[in-house]
Amino acid sequence: MGLQQIAYRSENAGGYMADGYARISNLPGIVTAQNGPAATLLVAPLAEALKASVPLIALVQDVNRSETDRNAFQEFDHIALFASCTKWVRRVTEASRVEDYIDQAFVAACSGVPGPVALMLPADLLLEAAPKAKRLSALGYFPLDRIGRFVSWTPTRRVEFRDPGRKQLGRPGYKE
């Protein structure tokens, strides 16, 4: 799956753009955000995606790991902020685990009832080189051959409720 970056002017606009992309493409939408007040602008689009069961992945920059819980500039408790408007929220603390957390984010967003997830990435972690993981047969804890099932989250069959005694309204091509 290739990623194309599209610029936006505010995080809430980016969140709604990712939501729209996910709805029309049948793939999870991805949005990025700065830490602090900018990250709070993602709450509304993530809440909408949660209620509409749209898979979104929010990658949010966090403060440096050494500055966590020290009242750093624009430091927020992002875990608490996103807990009520996402299915899953985590903070990466080691560069060697970035790939695992990205995999888990995709699986969490696309499996079960689809919905938004948030992943916090400390600013200093983004500057570190991450070792390339050897990918033989696993995507996080899921086999690689299963990921297609999670990414294509829209039902392929239409479900129809039939009542022989009633007219079937709203069904395309229905004739009495």
What is each of the regions a protein language model found here?
Residues 1-176:
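N-terminal alpha/beta PP-like core and its mobile active-site loop of ThDP/TPP-dependent enzymes
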